[in-house]
């Protein structure tokens, strides 16, 4: 396949339409670092059952703040580190990654939920930052997706523009799957040095907050640009945060 600039722009246009932040009946707050590892989430949801954290990398400020606020256990999965330094008792660490099928060092979210006795829970929280593997798990094989009331995910688009074009159907499947079940309530662009490079006002790496649809009583498309002062913070301190406003009618 040869690179087609027009098709590349078309795929980027679709991404902007798939990921549109909404104002809802739920207030927002930040949990975690005031840099990479912190996320903007929604308040006012039913009491959480537990936190599932994928891709912690021995950095658990999010899990600590989650426990301090909600007093809930964390189930942390990361096959790239051997342990969590000064691990608190409320945090259960597993040296195991997450994928769309079981391997020697990976397993599915469904199996994790089942193994931990949460199969009947409807208010789990997930934090997912797995460096591109998110595309593998967000599909119809993810049977317990609606056991989660809120999910924050860092998405990683391919580095190469031609790979973006080749991934069009994957983007279609993933974001259709998510938007059928959840409302996008926030997006924040990661300001790492390798972006932005999509010349369509869309970042290559971005964090999205999703709330399950049945928990959102009112919503309308956000009318303000991001980042939000006091909530959003640059992932890479010392570099300017990236401004997003593509959802606002010009």
What kind of region is each of these model predictions?
Residues 1-50, 59, 95, 105-122, ...:
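Rossmann-like AdoMet/SAM-dependent catalytic core
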Residues 57-70:
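Conserved SAM-binding loop of SAM-dependent methyltransferases across substrates and taxa
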Residues 58-59, 76-84:
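Short, polar loop motifs at secondary-structure junctions
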Residues 65-68, 82-91, 143-146:
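Short loop/helix-cap segments at secondary-structure boundaries that form the rim of catalytic
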Residues 96-99, 129:
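Conserved acidic residues
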Residues 126-133:
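Switch II (G3) loop of P-loop NTPases
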Residues 134-173:
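A short alpha/beta connector and helix-capping loop motif
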């Amino acid at each position: 396949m040869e690179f087609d600039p027009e098709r590349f722009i078309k795929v980027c246009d679709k991404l902007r339409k798939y990921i549109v932040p909404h104002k809802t009946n739920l207030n927002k707050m930040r949990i975690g670092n005031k840099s990479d590892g912190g996320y903007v989430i929604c308040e006012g949801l039913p009491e959480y059952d537990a936190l599932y954290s994928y891709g912690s990398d021995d950095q658990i400020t999010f899990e600590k703040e989650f426990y301090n606020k909600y007093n809930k256990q964390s189930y942390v999965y990361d096959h790239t580190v051997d342990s969590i330094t000064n691990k608190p008792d409320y945090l259960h660490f597993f040296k195991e990654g997450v994928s769309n099928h079981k391997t020697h060092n990976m397993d599915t979210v469904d199996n994790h939920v089942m193994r931990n006795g949460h199969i009947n829970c409807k208010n789990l929280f997930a934090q997912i930052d797995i460096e591109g593997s998110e595309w593998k798990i967000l599909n119809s094989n993810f049977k317990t997706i609606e056991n989660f009331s809120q999910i924050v995910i860092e998405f990683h688009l391919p580095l190469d523009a031609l790979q973006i074009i080749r991934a069009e159907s994957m983007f279609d499947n993933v974001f259709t799957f998510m938007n059928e079940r959840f409302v996008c309530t926030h997006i924040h662009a990661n300001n790492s040095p390798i972006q932005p490079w999509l010349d369509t006002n869309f970042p290559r790496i971005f964090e999205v907050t999703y709330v399950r649809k049945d928990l959102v009583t009112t919503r309308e498309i956000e009318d303000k640009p991001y980042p939000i002062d006091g909530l959003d913070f640059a992932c890479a301190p010392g570099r300017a945060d990236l401004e997003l406003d593509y959802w606002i009618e010009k």
